[in-house]
Every structure is written in structure tokens, then in C-alpha cells.
């Protein structure tokens, strides 16, 4: 599942379909080729109707001879029964809404990635091997990246900072919104303090490369519904994101998340 509907508020434009490779290839094409090489056999693109034609031309039609391709649409109005949002809201509702858009297309274990991140060939092989042995309920996995390999010299990034126990299970994931390197070589969280709180560069972080089973969907819908109902009418920007959902399911539903570490160096568009 490739989440490609985000608006890219900091980057501007549709960064998911801007050309970046040596021949102006779209970044996610590299991920798709790596995934197919590793053993994935279907890709579901989560996009918006307003750039569907361009997306099909630049991405979907390019790979449809290589892998089965399906489309799901993340639109603001796609809400669980009984939920509503303020008419003036324009910001997407987050990555949980994105994967829920694909609910009816997925009946097997699946991986989730961002369209605007490149994860490295080895990460896809690690993921596909683990998905093949994932228990059908209350189990998931996540490829963790070393924080030092995922920061940007060009501004702050958002990462899910992970705690992992001695058995390699995720114990918590904290969505951290303003991480950046400092001139002294440290990496800091600057969200609440401009001087920053120093983070361990060897910490594992989530880059939204998760592996799930279809068990997730009903749980995600329940939690997404609760999130929407908790919003005040004046809240126009709050999002419900995958690391927050995973953290809740671990603590409230007994979800076990195996952390698969990789030395791959991430790169993406921030």
C-alpha cells in the first residue's frame, strides 16, 4: 500500500508525482521495483481524484505490466458512519484515513509505505520475509531506521521515535514533529524548545514502513471514529497517524509489533 494522497504542506505541490531520478522518474517507482524484486505481487495506490489522470500516466501505467495495480481514494469526505468534519477544513485527516481507503481491496498481509520516501532494497526483502510468517491477528511488524540515517540538512522532519524491548518488540512509538541536526553534530527535537532536546542518534524511528494483516482495518476504523468524535469544531488541522494508532493498539488491544532493523539509509522529500 503506497500512501500518495498527502498534500505536502511544507514542500508545496504534489511531491508524490514530481520527477526526481536521473531520467525524471517518480521516487516511488524505485520503491515499487524494489518491492517486486523482493516478492510483493500487488500494489494499491492511495491517491486523490484530482490528480488521478496524471498519477496513472506517471506511475500506475508505468508499472502495471510489472505488478498488479489497484487504486483507492483518500478524500476528506470519506468518513465512518455517523462522523462529520467542519465544512471549512481542507487539511487531510492523516495516514489512518489513508489506509482505511484501501480496506476493501486488501485480504492478505500487506506492507504500508509513504510515496515520498525511499526505503532501500534490503528493507523490502526483510519485510516480505516477515510478512509471510505474521500471525493473522494482533501481530504486525515495522522496519525501523536509525535516527541518524533519517534526518535532513534542509529542515526539520517528523519521525515516530521507537522504544524496543530486549525481544525486539516495539513498546512505544512517540510521534516527534521537529527533529533536526545541529551544527555541533547532535540531533534534537525542537518542537517545544528552540535549543532542542538531544536525541540518541542510534534510536530507531518509524518511517511508516509497517507490515499488517487485515485484522488491522476494523480496529483502525474504531479508533479513527473515536478520533473524529473527539475533535472540537474549531480544530481544522489535527491528523490521526499510523504511529499513534499502532501505539494505541499495542497498549489497549495487545498488538505485538516486531521491529525489523535495517542499515539502509533512507532518503525522501521533506
Regions found by a protein language model. Name each.
Residues 1-60, 67-69, 74, 87, ...:
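N-terminal glycine-rich phosphate-binding loop and ensuing alpha1 helix
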Residues 8, 118-120:
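A short, conserved beta-strand element in the Rossmann-like catalytic core
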Residues 63-109:
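Short phosphate-binding loop-to-helix
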Residues 108-118:
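Short beta-strand-to-loop acidic/aromatic patch adjacent to the donor-nucleotide binding site
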Residues 121-210:
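Conserved core of the sugar-phosphate nucleotidyltransferase
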Residues 204, 258-265:
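Catalytic beta-strand/loop signature of glycosyltransferases that borders the donor
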Residues 209-220:
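Conserved nucleotide-sugar donor-binding
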Residues 221-255:
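A C-terminal functional module that forms or caps the active site or interfaces directly
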